[in-house]
């Protein structure tokens, strides 16, 4: 008996030991919800991966719930896929045999806003205007305000919180990719690759992101790697009445396969013109190839290569006189007929491929790091007409308009009613005189053929060709359960070549490389008229140009950026705090590749000096050739974020930050086309920004309210235009521009509770964006070293100030300061119908500094009156506008393998064609008056929104 008991006890102990020796098994469960509405997502497919091996696949039930049991301890990847949502991946760790509750796993809907990118805006011809018309591209489909405003406000080129578009940080694969020269967003570099670039993460305002420190206007990181492209084969066809007739797109992605590889490809073509603007067209293509390799749980490598070769015709701004005469606010002066076919003089031609390689290292749940190297290269050209000793070929040149011949104001010295009648007849009967109201290409060719080979007119191509090398490394470390530390290092080496080349001789045989303005002023000094002085010194004659030859100017913009950042997030129950800092070093310089006769600089040695003297060349301090002084800046910034969660649905959070940023290359040189001269006393831009936010999110309800405030000081700006008073192409360099931006944002989407699946949605952006300083201005001209105005005050920049002290505030232009949208959204059974009404107000015309100097206000008699002050310095305010937009779409999910869908969007349903979306004051002055007492402005130029536009997109996914 005792033996039996001992044997039984031994067997029990052995069985227990065997059980204890086995790995504990646990699991993972949770609920899949719509990130925006918080509604449960039924039939979402969840695939669990261990490394690259697929373990199990389950679907969510009607309440969005799922359960995956019997998992050994370890690290897993959970891939969540559902119709009309972006694919999402999350990391899961199972410990000690427990079933891990993931609670709510949110999916981002594929909204119509994803069709909005930089190419959703017409290419405007405004290179020489000093006007910046770049809108803010709003992403963040998890944010109700951005999700609605990003689509509904795109027509009026809305800028979030009134901030300049270059303050919005855009990352690709963890690399900040804002343009090194201008700071502008780089969206055009991947336009047409919607599927490849669809997966992204966004933070708003001054929040700190996972990928970089960011600024005060949000951060968007586009993943761009193969594993984040939605699995399967997808094709789509789209037609768009505002941009192009046809877009064809196809994409294919394998997802992460059993062998750890993932491959993806995306191609597209955008072709044709549009319904509104003659001469504007697209002939653009795009390609994307990417591969990921998951070696194991710890190591992953990603590579991608893509580009968007193509060309598109540009639209030009015109004066209201021209629009009224033509009876069309969509008139475009950039085109004309050549042999009966439309030809645009202004065409953007680009192909700037990008390649990146990214390494991800994830040794544990508590630490991961990544490093990315990225290289951008290629060509970016922009054609325009150039001419020598010939009539200006632009049809809307002011000397071709009726107002040049007659004006009711007799002081304007325009009193020729006969010529006014002839001009008015031409412009009001444009169909009968197309050769006069548009570019007369046939006349240009005939003129060139009569010049014994030397072309009077050519088509030039202005190039901005970048070689841009970037490195970004970042890490995430969780030293304890309630703390997360992030940081990183960045480096950028950019060399951009600015030059122009002969694109078309237009029937001529050659063109001479001389400076037209210098030839007029220095005809007796031949070396001064040479664009390439070294060639003239060697051969004794100006260069003879053929197609493809560089001429006029040629220089490098050299930019170097290095930085580091660190952030720490600490959680204490419902309260969390994030502190972050950034330290950087930025430098840039100009490197001239062509010695210009007007600015030869100092000889490098005595022999050169003797050669120059023999030719009559006089050395100058200002040089067009060689390396300029180096401008360098140490920059720093700090941020604080506080976040308090109230219950399960509300949170209150605040952000505050102080930032110093180096000026950009394009705003630092007085005349980079001609010489190395930097603006005096350049300073970093200093910004203080703060916002306070309240957010409520529950199933069906999503609300965010934000109050924001910012001061942006010590900005600089350089603009170029022809100055009639100097009879030369002139440059106006401003420094010390301060502004204040404050306002309120509200976004909401709430159920009606009357009709199932019908919601009321709306946004409100109310701002006050004003100038708070009067900057100083330096004016130079391209054909002389003389400084026309040296660091003079612009006393009427921030406001119009009358003699009695009465002030009228001036506002930051480029965006409506009041924008509102209210509408209904219906979502049921994969149908969506949105109808919205928009209201925009408080938009202002972009100002030029010359009109706001004492010199311009005093006029020729050096006397200031209230009449002159108001006339010359007041800022134009645009009329408010109402718009109606409608969107409808449907998708069908077939056997959970195939998806067929369409979306149809109509913008500006009321066909309102009188909405000004922007414009600028010409930097020109009428001085040939009868009284010789005052100056008069030239008419400003405007951009208008087109009438009713539609976009139809049909797609099929395998």
List each model region and its residues.
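Short acidic/polar hinge/loop motifs at secondary-structure boundaries
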Residues: 137, 144-146, 175-206, 222-225, ...
